[in-house]
UniProtKB/Swiss-Prot annotation:
Membrane-crossing residue ranges in chain numbering: none
One GO biological process term: ribosome disassembly
Pfam families: EF-G_D2 (PF22042), EFG_C (PF00679), EFG_III (PF14492), EFG_IV (PF03764), GTP_EFTU (PF00009)
Name of the protein described by the UniProt record: Elongation factor G
UniProt keyword list: Cytoplasm, Elongation factor, GTP-binding, Nucleotide-binding, Protein biosynthesis
Chain ranges of the tr-type G domain: 8-282
Homology family: Belongs to the TRAFAC class translation factor GTPase superfamily. Classic translation factor GTPase family. EF-G/EF-2 subfamily.
Function: Catalyzes the GTP-dependent ribosomal translocation step during translation elongation. During this step, the ribosome changes from the pre-translocational (PRE) to the post-translocational (POST) state as the newly formed A-site-bound peptidyl-tRNA and P-site-bound deacylated tRNA move to the P and E sites, respectively. Catalyzes the coordinated movement of the two tRNA molecules, the mRNA and conformational changes in the ribosome.
Native organism taxonomy: Bacteria, Bacillati, Bacillota, Clostridia, Eubacteriales
Organism the protein comes from: Clostridium acetobutylicum (strain ATCC 824 / DSM 792 / JCM 1419 / IAM 19013 / LMG 5710 / NBRC 13948 / NRRL B-527 / VKM B-1787 / 2291 / W)
Domain of life: Bacteria
PANTHER family tied to this protein: RIBOSOME-RELEASING FACTOR 2, MITOCHONDRIAL (PTHR43261:SF1), TRANSLATION ELONGATION FACTOR G-RELATED (PTHR43261)
Positions with a binding annotation for GTP: 17-24, 81-85, 135-138
Cross-referenced InterPro entries: EF-G-like_DII, EFG_II, EFG_III, EFG_III/V, EFG_IV, EFG_V, EFG_V-like, G_TR_CS
Length: 687
């Protein structure tokens, strides 16, 4: 099948922002102008096309990232809508993995807010080229220039305006295109009619100042242009665009545009910039991975290369069942064909292929290199798996997901729904790698764990709506962990020899604290323990580590070296070695100076100045460490690290202390040792 658009005319972009910066409205407008929707959906009326789960429409926030295809000026644009609420940063992480470029949306009044910083850092991690769109130019307190300065100060971004606004707040009329040196004024409400005019006389000087700053920033990226500029020659629009595109793709410059999506101003110009400056799949480096022998390998964006695709999100659709949102990096994926899930080493059949327009879908015969779509009919594939051709397998770099920090006990309102709830929770955990569910061995309760209170509220909500399971939910608990502080050597010996067949397993391990994940190293020499019993020892240790010895919390950040052991020709079995492994682990834990770790949250509280003292005192009383303070838009911002256990119910307390004027955001930062007195309290509560 011939391509409708050549690869250089593809743009796979994400729209990322702080909650409420107007990201979904912006996406809506893009869909409207690119002809995908005939009626504009307003978020505050609860009808936005991208927000397709009922909870999103009620809360006016975006939770799942839907991939939508639209067309603009002979380009195919795939938009991945990412949530801005901090409990859903995992959605942002996974969408950034499959994007080539991103538009960061900022609120002209708030500028760079805490979540914008988080999302920006995530984009840095994946080297995603970005442009910025400063939205809400029509609201009270909008300040374009302050927002640009905040991008420079707080994000260390080389932010360069390529447009400046004409007027602001109620008088926001349009913008000045600094590259073409002309004014664009909107003459109707839908923003479909606009006039290109001369720059208003009272703005000529300002436009000149910003235009020369922009040209200086751009020529710095290109030696040839620099020489031309220094010799006083005129630099053409084409030259500016070419140099700017190169700079954006190399992550050296961030062009800044402005507008008001709600008032339909500036969106088309922002789309022009997406097409003009953000990379196509050909502009980014080949995707990296490993072949079946573990050697480094890569795939270029080319239809003739072997197939390599990444399933970046699993969603359950009420009509077609499981949808796997996938990006094809190389080769062609055909409906009805077989592929290899190289992460799991299993064959999968591609049922149907669909391109999504938020929640209508269009069936296609194939997805080519650089395209995004969803696969219907995969059985085994989960988030982060690689799909590749059977005769040329590759495993693309895996995605990393943080561990949950908060958990609650949950039970169905009727005994009859117990099984239904179990199935539903398993489905939800398959969709969302940061959501975990397990049964507490001591109490028999079902526990759900996630990234924050909102995250779990939405899970419970979905259980009721999508799976029709009514639940009772306990009080949120902190997901504590246990770890060790010193290296030790210990053994576990399991011997049972009382008539009939006995049991014999014996393992000697060295256990050391580490910063990273659990590691197991087999250092047995001379066959002291036969090969087939090594894995059972590892399994025994891993199972035992799920329930630590201080207060039964999972043990993390340690590594094990199996150094010795012994076996019995007749009595040894896998089971016996598994038990020996878990005994060795427990013996090692008691000697290794174990401690409890608690999640520490990065908290930002924004309050009017008069409440500053009171709020700082309150943060300190919650065992908080204040990291810094700054003034922002007439309010004081306090930045601190506070243990999660002290933050439950903080929203209510902050509201009452500040008469509803204070706001805060928090997100998980790291785990830290619990002070002795608190540790004793935790142990007491568990007993």
């Amino acid at each position: 099948m011939a391509r409708k658009y050549p690869l250089e005319k593809f743009r796979n972009i994400g729209i990322m922002a702080h909650i409420d910066a107007g990201k979904t409205t912006t996406t809506e407008r893009i869909l409207f102008y690119t002809g995908k929707t005939h009626k504009i959906g307003e978020v505050h009326e609860g009808a936005a096309t991208m927000d397709w789960m009922v909870q999103e429409q009620e809360r006016g926030i975006t939770i799942t990232s839907a991939a939508t295809t639209c067309y603009w000026k002979d380009h195919e644009i795939n938009i991945i809508d990412t949530p801005g609420h901090v409990d859903f940063t995992v959605e942002v992480e996974r969408s950034l993995r499959v994007l080539d470029g991103a538009v960061a949306v900022f609120d002209a009044k708030g500028g760079v807010e805490p979540q914008s910083e988080t999302v920006w850092r995530q984009a840095e991690k994946y080297n995603v080229p970005r442009m910025a769109y400063i939205n809400k130019m029509d609201i009270l307190g909008a300040d374009f220039y302050r927002s640009v300065q905040m991008m420079r100060d707080r994000l260390s971004a080389n932010a360069v305006p390529i447009q400046i606004p004409i007027g602001k707040e109620d008088n926001f009329l349009g913008l000045i295109d600094l590259i073409r040196n002309e004014a664009i004024v909107y003459t109707d409400d839908l923003g479909t009619t606009m006039e290109e005019q001369e720059i208003p006389a009272d703005m000529k000087e300002l436009a000149e100042k910003y235009r020369s700053e922009m040209i200086e920033a751009i020529v710095e990226l290109d030696e040839e242009l620099m020489n031309k500029y220094l010799e006083g020659e005129e630099i053409s629009v084409e030259e500016i665009n070419a140099a700017l595109r190169k700079g954006v793709i190399a992550n050296e410059i961030v062009p800044v545009t402005c507008g008001s999506s709600y008032k339909n101003k500036g969106v088309q110009q922002m789309l022009d910039a997406v097409v003009e400056y953000l990379p196509s799949p050909l502009d980014i480096p080949p995707v990296k991975g490993v072949d079946e022998d573990g050697n480094d390998d890569e795939r270029k964006a080319d239809d003739s290369e072997p197939l390599a695709a990444l399933a970046f999100k699993i969603a359950t659709d009420p009509f077609v069942g499981k949808l796997a949102f996938t990006r094809v990096y190389s080769g062609v994926m055909k409906a009805g064909s077989y592929v290899l899930n190289s992460t799991k080493g299993k064959k999968e059949r591609i049922g149907r292929l669909v391109k999504m327009h938020s929640n209508h879908r269009q069936e296609v015969e194939e997805l080519e290199a650089g395209e995004l779509g969803a696969i219907v009919g995969l059985k085994l594939t989960t988030t982060g798996d690689t799909l590749s051709s059977e005769d040329n397998p590759i495993i693309l770099e895996k995605m990393e997901f943080p561990d949950p920090v908060i958990e609650v006990a949950i039970e169905p309102k009727t005994k009859a729904s117990q099984e239904k709830m179990g199935i539903a929770l398993a489905k939800l955990a398959e969709e969302d790698p940061t959501f975990k569910t397990y049964t507490n061995q001591e109490t028999g309760q079902t526990i759900i764990a996630g990234m924050g209170e909102l995250h779990l509220e939405i899970i419970v909500d979905r259980l009721q709506r999508e799976f029709k399971v009514e639940c009772n939910v306990g009080k949120p608990q902190v997901a504590y962990k246990e770890t060790i502080r010193k290296p030790v050597k210990a053994e576990g010996k399991f011997v049972r020899q009382s008539g009939g067949r006995g049991q014999y397993g014996h393992a000697v391990i060295e256990m050391t604290p580490t910063e990273g994940e659990y590691e197991f190293e087999n250092a047995i020499v001379g066959g002291a323990v036969p090969k087939e019993y090594i894995q059972p020892i590892d399994n025994g240790i891993q199972e035992a580590s799920l329930s630590g010895i201080i207060a039964g919390y999972p043990t993390v950040n340690f590594k094990v070296r199996l150094v010795d052991g012994s076996y019995h020709d007749v009595d040894s079995s896998e089971m016996a070695f598994k038990i020996a492994g878990s005994m060795a682990f427990k013996n090692a834990m008691t000697k290794a100076d174990p401690v409890i770790l608690e999640p520490i949250m990065k908290v930002e509280v924004t309050v009017p100045e008069e409440y500053m003292g009171d709020i700082m005192g309150d943060v300190n009383s919650r065992r908080g460490r204040i990291e810094g303070m700054e003034q922002r838009a007439g309010a004081e911002v306090i930045r601190a690290f506070v243990p999660l256990s002290e933050m439950f119910g903080y929203a209510t307390s902050l509201r009452s202390r500040t008469q509803g004027r204070g706001v805060f955001t928090m997100q998980f930062d790291h785990n830290e040792e619990v002070p002795k007195n608190i540790q004793e309290k935790i142990i007491g509560e568990k007993k």
